Amino acid sequence: MTDSHLTGQNNTDDAANVDTYSLTIMTDRNQALAATVYRPSDAVKTAIMIAPATGIKRQFYHNFATYLAEHGFGVLTFDNEGIGESLTTDLAKCDASLISWGRHDMPAVLDALQDEFADAAYHLIGHSAGGQLIGLMPNYNMLASVFNVACSSGQIKNMAMPYRAKAMFFMDALIPIANLALGYTPSDKMGMGEPLPRGVARQWREWCNGAGYIKTAFDKSIHTHFYDEISMPALWLGFSDDDIANSENMDDMIRVFTRMPIEKRFLDPKDFGVRSIGHMRYFSSKTNAKAPALWQMAVDWLRKGE
């Protein structure tokens, strides 16, 4: 499924003694995905793929990935098809979708992780969509565990005002109009990551307007999935100031994973001396500087499997 090629020069992080290098991963759709490998100096027993949120480039996770590598974990970050350096055509011509991200991109990345770190235990850290789409991965059983951050159904009706009004405008007005006029959705204009391929944006809109997110597509555009088979342990982190992944929406997504043993932690940033974490700031080095216990939760979870 994957054909991995080194595409950049190796460099060693001065502070961490972490070898960081670029990788190109070919999916079974014959699409090239840009990726970065973080390799610690010692032998790797545990390796992690960081699956990104919708429209978020892999560089966003650099500090977090470096931190994990400093703690001895092998790490691989990547751009989904149509995002960042994995956009290889005019965006209006890109036919990527949320389904293709989960069914083709993420499995290819997991295969590449195994190629890079042989004889390790493999884990997935999912941010928002990166955790939602695991049930589309045919090789999900290679994962020993999952650590999800801000992962929920994103159901609009469960959001509080005024954020719900913003979400309704984005989903129900901007996406269909922009897709029709431009052939893609300029989500960056709303401060929501990179511009999105129209298929990604269209499915995002459809799924956030129904219960269970991806469950709304079962027996419609999705006829094969593994949500009722996945049984590896998972820790899901959420934060009380997250307008999207509120507690109700987290539970809505958790219910889709019918056999996954999930530990849910819904946390108040103020309990950690942090003013705000929301949907994105867990991965910020500034958050880690103020609340190191939060990143340590990921390390502790991953260590359980060693």
Label every model-predicted segment:
Residues 2-39:
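N-terminal cap/lid segment of alpha/beta-hydrolase-fold proteins
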Residues 58-90:
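Conserved alpha/beta-hydrolase
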Residues 95-116:
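Alpha/beta-hydrolase active-site loop
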Residues 125-212:
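Alpha/beta-hydrolase-fold enzymes
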Residues 230, 236-238:
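Short beta-strand/loop motif that positions the catalytic acidic residue
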Residues 245-256:
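Short alpha-helix in the alpha/beta-hydrolase fold that links the catalytic acid
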Residues 263, 267-306:
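Catalytic active-site module of serine/aspartate enzymes centered on a nucleophile-bearing elbow/loop
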